[in-house]
Amino acid sequence: CESLISNASGAKNWVFWHHWPDAKLHDYGAGQGLELLTKDAAQQLSSDDFWAFVERLATGRRLVITSDHGYAATGYFPDADGEVAAYLKKTFSSGRSKAGNGETSPFIPPVALHIDSPHGPHLLAVGRRKWRSQGGYPTLTHGGLSLLEVLSPFIELTK
């Protein structure tokens, strides 16, 4: 990103998108996502290079830092049991969404939600629960419908 700014014109309206930290999350092994992502974020966001980059972007313009989703430490979610666990495992396997139509279950509160999106119908697991699955359950997820996954920062800086 730094080289883009150095070679860019004096335009004030820029949009930068970066794959960090998602790319890191996908590179980490099972059970390591939360700890390694936290350490990496602390290192990156406290570095002099990062803050010099932010200062350069914020000088003479409005800088907004945001994200397209949040993260949930699903490894700390309580285990579902009984019929709920069986339904979630059968429906979602090790994930939290499934393309297509299907039963959303008779559970109160609901454990699944049906949506029709531009990409077709989907079932989504809702709530803070996890279930046993072959290969283990991910300790950190993103892109789902839990509160932590839909919260996104919105930070505005001007210099």
Give short role names for the model-derived ranges.
Residues 1-159:
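Feature captures the catalytic ectodomains and active-site-proximal regions of enzymes
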